[in-house]
């Protein structure tokens, strides 16, 4: 312990200069003139608004990914959020710190370069191959473009690579020093990087699954390792922190400890971190904002301002005589409230069917005095809350009386206007014909704890089951024609199969009715409600609702000028114009280095064919490769080719609008595979020294051509140079590339 | 150190290699580990009584088959009205008998067989099959129902034989057979005119013959080997020919074959030539043969359905020309498009229709107030357009002018014949699709402006080619804005007479919405040719009908705010399907699995995963298992694994499907799940009996366990049989109903 007194303190620094140089070049290529153009470029218009929401701490909902990504972008913030993100190409006002906002993605992009070097090195390929991978990352135009803007792909790629790198480091530690400090560090870092990747974009799940899969295979082999004991007596040993890092103890460590450590680091830590992202997110954005409407009433009430201001101080328990507004829980196609108004259903519909000609009941997406209903006890006449209030419980019979017209909610065996298989719902008018009122409803609390639960404001989700016909009050989702003012249709659904949000309602605004007289009551309805009860949703409830809505939210598939299909990506048949200078023809495109893209795909094909060939030969007991070279080849393929596959193939199953930048994570894995294949060819397929030299010369020539292409496309990557129409035409190497040429 | 990835797993010993063909299997020599387990089982008679054993074997099979047939055919004629989807498939059977063309999202084999069964049993195809609940009256429907029930009855013996072969245990096979015989769901689904019994018949036949041919592996190229291999191929073709769900069993057989070939390839005692022979045999029997049969069913389908019918509109104009009764049949029109021709233009996407215009303007506030242009599905004079040169307005039909053909890349003008307005577009947003431009009719008597000019292009052809009627796929590109004429498929509001919107899309993507073809073509100056020349060849018809089927399938999207069945509902038997009857006076049939069977299946899957992984980990850790346990674990891992794979393949893909799903989609998976239950419980009980061998009654555990499971399922069937055989009287919500106590879940409504 006191060893440093006996010996002099010596610091030996081991600096890999090539790594430093790579980092330097990476930083230079990504950070050079970062604030140019000082205008909104492409999707910055989209992510920018969320940065502003963070700055103003306003709640928002974005279905494109978990909040960690937006948070990372907002980290560079430090402005008041006052900028209108509405148009690509709009000049940034002076209060927007463009440099710091773009800094983090750029740093992530720059650090990907040395990480590529490290990964190939950890795969046990040569320094040369590693340099090759890093240099390819360095000159890949699409990666440069994407990292220099406020976009998330470069951060996602950074965490993907970090996850793979730290897993490899961990795996290499496993052989000589399990349970050492660095072993734990890399294992934990793998989990952390995976969950960060998932937190940036859901796409990160693909890499997470890959890492999990490789880890599972390795753990399976570990299980087969008979030198490790079972759960046995050594359990205490590995639990004792003292034995961590001691090599001689590693033999005694049980298999169970190994599996447990992996499970904790790769399963528990990511889940916890993921929840943490949401926790921080919900703490940061606590004010109500434009996306409130999508969330349930309970969620809205937990935000500051907005609904909370209205519902603050409402009585909690709904009683007979309560005045309420009822919101549909499903909220599709739009969130709306149960509504009625003076107008009646037309006697005869356009298609010739008849109606009951009674008062319309609809669902209305705006706050309105006609949304108020009074919960009435069918056995009594008064419409006020008695004292003490008699709360309504699950299973109680109620009538719902429309506040402004005092007609009660009714349904009967008449076909609904737009959904003829369901019953019409109306407010009953007694025309004195043989059509009696059928206005008794039984209250079912869906999320009840017990059968005697009380109907609570906001918290209870209830269904109204019609007593005579056992139809359920339902929002059909169809818009009524002009006679119904394009409001939404409400029906009585007879065949109610199980739970569906469109049949479930909750009370949003609520007050105890006090006036028996209709005039007074109308005045009461017009005035806002008050009295105070605090209701806080737990974090898990808010998390699960937010997560669920994010996954369920489906923006209608809008076609986009630059959307593309996955097949076009491999051969780079498409590009995206990101920005055009308002006056000159300087422009920024997402356009890859075509030499790298094509050779990456070629390398992948070569890898697949060679592997198949080797596998078949090994099956016939012909071993072309020495065992260690074979294992290296397989592991590199599992991670690099596998990484490409998991990040690319799932897009074929997706129905959303896809863009070229979705391919970039897959591309980075392809770039990692390229030098691996090249070195393999040089080491194992070139038989003589001469062949090897020729091959190296070819590789050098190929790399210079890649550099040349990268340099040629540079004006489109950085957008720093205005090119003449002629030069632009010369850059349009493929007919499908859309390069903007100004007409004068 | 074991290998990092690959290699290691494939060489593991979990191979379904050993075994004997057919019934002899049970008599196989004791060398076989699996058979050894059976040898010590309590059911196993002494060696001397082989004859007796064979008789018993056949008797049991006969018993199982008989019971299956008896339950399926019991009260088959009730109810004597249309139940549920009988209205579709019965109707399609009638179409075959009447030879009228129709369209369905499923391949034709199933409906063809139904039609054949009806035809042979004397049904004349005159019943309309309008809606569920219609009485059959004097029409003969028993032939079709009987055929479906006949195929459905075979499921039980097939499952019995499959499990027997996989586990070599009679008790496991019996348990499986009991589960399936006494499942009300399978029973109900087999009793009506539906595709499902036919589909499941082929799926199980494929599974059985695959298992049989696996157990023939030690005698390759022998007669039974060939027989089972080719039978697998035939069944695969059958399964795929009924519904596309058949792809899953094809996948399973494919995976099995790949594993099999991989094993053979690694067997160094076989020469490469022998391996090549194996490969060829499989390619022949499992790829070529099924493909040929599958294609043949389509050939028959198109041959039988030669008359025009309700399905015409789904297909292209060229296709319709081959249906007698269609107005394109035997028609003769000029082949190449020329200036001055009067034409109709049809969108290539299904159910969009013809380019149409009429004397009504777009309403105030929606783009420019010019004449509407829409698409319309029916034939109408307002669908006629005259094709003219963009720069002259002279009448090209003037006999003094020579005929001039329209060529790919020409600039043209399309004049609406009835109103003499030109097809026009401009920078106004379209009525429904805001990102597209509006298309209108503009100009007076053919005189408009430069926004009326369109470039006509043939997709994937060279410039300068002539444009063929029906065959050429053409696009109209607006000259000024560069957008493409297309239809968004959205229905216009009332002002547009609920016809479909036509727009000019600025996104130059090649979608079918923006591709058109010329259908009618009138030009007196040109010689008419018979359309028969244009008739598509058989491969083209095959391709087209598949495209239409796939599009139809993906078009079955659920609407918002509609109750839909979710895949996770299925294994827990969450809710059933109403086959017939709603009210308490109706004869009600309700498709619902026997909950005892289904929940046992669910439990078994969980137990299997647990026990399977325990055994796999134990083996990987190198635990030394006693011979008996090793044998039983082999059965569990190999046999159970195959069946579990079947369940996985027939269940999980549904989670990825976007189309509307129904409860009955789960039934193929349920068959596999029941087989797994049989294998699992038999093996677990045997393991139990072995573990407690010191206990005097140990042997009894197995017998008692199996017997109680058998009796339990039989009793639950007794309770739930009214679901399948029909019930009248109060609904189960009513405490008076005899079914009242059986409504175990609120979501069941019978």
Curated annotation (Swiss-Prot), chain B:
List the glycosylation sites. Answer: 98, 330, 445, 528, 583
Instruction: Tell me what topology the record assigns in the membrane.
Output: Multi-pass membrane protein
A Pfam family for this UniProt protein? Answer: PMT_4TMC
Keywords assigned: Congenital muscular dystrophy, Dystroglycanopathy, Endoplasmic reticulum, Glycoprotein, Glycosyltransferase, Limb-girdle muscular dystrophy, Lissencephaly, Membrane, Metal-binding, Phosphoprotein, Repeat, Transferase, Transmembrane, Transmembrane helix
Name the SUPFAM superfamilies for this protein. Answer: MIR domain
User: Biological process GO annotation list?
Assistant: basement membrane organization; dentate gyrus development; protein O-linked mannosylation; reactive gliosis
Tissue-specific expression: Highly expressed in testis; detected at low levels in most tissues.
Q: State the pathway, as annotated in the record.
A: Protein modification; protein glycosylation
Q: Where does the MIR domain lie? A: 334-390, 403-459, 464-521
Q: What Enzyme Commission number(s) does the record list for this chain?
A: 2.4.1.109
Region (Disordered) location: 1-23
Q: Which SMART domains match?
A: MIR
Q: Which residues form the signal peptide?
A: none
Query: One Gene Ontology cellular component annotation?
Result: nucleoplasm
Q: Where in the cell is it found?
A: Endoplasmic reticulum membrane
| Origin superkingdom | Eukaryota
> What task does this protein carry out?
Transfers mannosyl residues to the hydroxyl group of serine or threonine residues. Coexpression of both POMT1 and POMT2 is necessary for enzyme activity, expression of either POMT1 or POMT2 alone is insufficient. Essentially dedicated to O-mannosylation of alpha-DAG1 and few other proteins but not of cadherins and protocaherins.
Record family assignment: Belongs to the glycosyltransferase 39 family.
According to the record's subunit comment, the protein's assembly and interactions are: Interacts with POMT1.
Illness the protein is tied to = Muscular dystrophy-dystroglycanopathy congenital with brain and eye anomalies A2: An autosomal recessive disorder characterized by congenital muscular dystrophy associated with cobblestone lissencephaly and other brain anomalies, eye malformations, profound intellectual disability, and death usually in the first years of life. Included diseases are the more severe Walker-Warburg syndrome and the slightly less severe muscle-eye-brain disease.
Record protein name field:
Protein O-mannosyl-transferase 2
Q: Give the organism the record lists.
A: Homo sapiens (Human)
UniProt gene name: POMT2
